[in-house]
Design a protein with these regions (language model features):
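Long terminal segments
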Residues: 147-159
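Thr-biased low-complexity repeat/linker tracts and other Thr-enriched repetitive architectures
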Residues: 1-150
Length: 159
């Protein structure tokens, strides 16, 4: 593991394996960064959050709570992943997007713009949630489905 630049690891946080933390990134609390994961830029990983595998958290992104980001997932821009949210596979969460609650974003799904995915919602396969769209409750958005604009999906399947 490497921690360099102005990066900081504090509290009971731990960085190990081939993980990299650099730039002005902050890893603290009980957070773990491991495997080949990278945390860089001004990103923060804190609370009990896990970032592992080949995941990349960068820019001004924040991953917190009991959330985890793994696989080849990327969280960047001003994106927030918090509570118990999970981002994995080749998923991307970026822009000002938020993923929270017990929500999951996986496979090659993308959540971006000012979109919000929360509750027990799942966004997976090649699905996209963008603009100011909200996906929540027990909603599942999958396949090549796109939810955008000011749309709200609070239950059921879209795929």
């Amino acid at each position: 593991a490497w921690v360099y630049g102005n990066a900081n690891v504090s509290g009971d946080a731990w960085v190990y394996g081939n993980a990299l933390v650099y730039g002005n990134a902050q890893v603290y609390g009980n957070a773990l960064v491991y495997g080949n994961a990278k945390v860089s830029g001004d990103a923060w990983v804190f609370g009990n959050a896990l970032v592992y595998g080949d995941a990349n958290v960068c820019g001004n992104a924040k991953v917190s709570g009991d959330s985890w980001v793994n696989g080849n997932a990327q969280v960047y821009g001003n994106a927030l992943v918090f509570h118990d949210a999970k981002v994995f596979g080749d998923a991307k969460v970026y822009g000002n997007a938020e993923v929270s609650g017990d929500a999951e974003v996986s496979d090659k799904a993308k959540v971006y713009g000012n979109a919000q995915v929360f509750g027990d919602a799942e966004v997976f396969a090649n699905a996209k949630v963008s603009d100011k769209a909200k996906v929540y409750g027990n909603a599942q958005v999958f396949g090549d489905a796109e939810v955008s604009g000011n749309a709200e999906v609070s239950g059921g399947l879209i795929g």
